[in-house]
Structures are given as structure tokens and as C-alpha cells.
Amino acid sequence: GSISLSLLVMQWLGVSAAVFTCSFGLVIGTLLLAGRDLKIALFSLSTAALAGAFNLHHAVTADTAYAEYLIGDVTLPGQVSPRAFWVNKSTASLLDDSEPPNYTRYIQHLRRVLRDELGFRDKAILVLGAGGFTLSHREPLNHYTYVDIDLAIKEIAEKHFLREAARGEFIADDARRFIATTARRFDAVVVDVYSSHTSIPSHLVTREFWAGTRRALKQDGILLINLILDGKLESPYARNLLATIESEYGRCAVEVLHKGKPISNVEVACFASSHPAPVGRYRDEKNQADLDKALR
């Protein structure tokens, strides 16, 4: 059952169909075991009807083996016909018809860092996690390569969300596999690999994964990471994840975009030239701050 669901139903009909198939199979099994018990039979049939109703009225733009995608209109002050790209019921991208278009705040932040602060022109930028392909939207100055595990995401985004061709190369592959096998080196690697609102696949948070991102960078390259953490960075997950990244890269810049909210986009920037180093603490009795400043 699990083999046929994963290889046949999920691949061809999507996750929702696989879940409904499991529910339907459980109902049939319950009816067979219940025999002539009318109460159990009615309960089973009601469950099947409820599951079917949810699936019939489930507003999904596309459903693949990896995710549910929904594109729909939203209301945002000051924007022209804004629309959202939801992945597994979580907002992945925003876009409107203004000139220039408006994007989600973290995408605006990343675009500003790359184009304005770093002055990137004619640079190679690797984006792990395609989202709505808005990082390169109408951005002809640099060369973008998107890597996403779902082959269908590009066509879905182009047809229903961007309503135009996505700018950049697209490679359907697992992010960790790609950085471990590619011979290419990039000026920037952007990591945005959420499978839902606050969930990163566990194999993409380890020190070994972050070491792999360094492998894909040029010597003077930069790693940019979009995280969703608690706004105060007090949770064990936030502390441990940031510590894991810095165990590979040394000190990184960390910016919380929504400081007044319990959950926030947190943007991390690490340079390939940086490495972990021993640290000291300045104390009244022993303070070498002036010496350290002279050695900058």
C-alpha cells in the first residue's frame, strides 16, 4: 500500500488524493470488520462523505507529490491587484501589478542586499528553494539558478502566479544533493528551503549542509539565508540553528525583519572568507579592546 501510494497515487494525482485513498481504505476495512453493526457502518460512511466533501471543495491550484500549491488574490493596502503564492497552506511569495512590483518584505530585503548593498552585476546567484521565483523577477542584471525538488513548481508559478516566464535557469533536484555534486561556483547562494510556514527539511539544517553551501561558493562569495524563527531568537531551535550555521562560517550578520511579532523572517548573511575563530571576553581587569581594534 505505501509503495503504490508513493509511486503511483502521489506522483500522478498528488498528496490530497493519496490521503483520501488512505481514508477510503480505512473506511472499507472498518466496514468489513464491523459486520452488521449499524452504528459503526453509519460512522464510517459519514467519515467517507466528510473526507470527500473536503476534497471536492479544497481550493488547490495544483497538487504534486511534494506540495499543494494555491495562488489567489489578497488584500494589501497600497498595492495593485496583489496575489499570493501559497505552498502547503503557507505564504511563499507575494506579487502585485504595480510598477515596479511589490514583493514580500524578505524578498525586497534580499534584492536590496544583492543589487544595492553588494552592487551585484553580471554575477552568478544560486537560489535553493524556488518559491514564486520573485527574487529574479524582472531583474536582468544577474544570472540566477533555481534549485527545487519539485519539477512542477516552475510551470505552476509561471502560469498562475508570475503570468510570465520565470527569469533564470531551473534545476529540479534536492538542494543538498545539488550542492554536493555541482562543479559550479557561485557569487551568492540564497537558501530559502521551507516546505511549509516554519518547517525546513531536517537534512537542510545540519552543519554538513552548511559546509556544502560553502563548497558551492566562490572564495569571495556570500551566503544569504531566509529563516522563520521566533522574533526574539530565544527558542532552542533558533539558538541551535544559528549556532550551527556559525559553527561553519563564524560570525554572521543576523537581521530580524519583524521584531514586534512572535514569528518573523530572520535574514542571515555569511561570507565564504569567514571561518570560526576563538573568541575572548573583555573584562575590567583584562581588557584588550584597544589592541584588537588596532589589529582590524
Where are these regions (language model features)?
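Glycine/proline-centered helix-kink
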Residues: 1-6
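Symmetry-related core transmembrane helices of the 12-TM Major Facilitator Superfamily/SLC fold
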Residues: 19-48
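Class I S-adenosylmethionine
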Residues: 45-147, 151-162, 237, 241, ...
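Conserved SAM-binding strand-loop segment of SAM-dependent methyltransferases
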Residues: 164-175
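A short acidic, Gly/Pro-enriched loop at the edge of an enzyme's catalytic core
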Residues: 180-193
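Conserved beta-strand signature within the Rossmann-like core of class I S-adenosyl-L-methionine
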Residues: 220-227
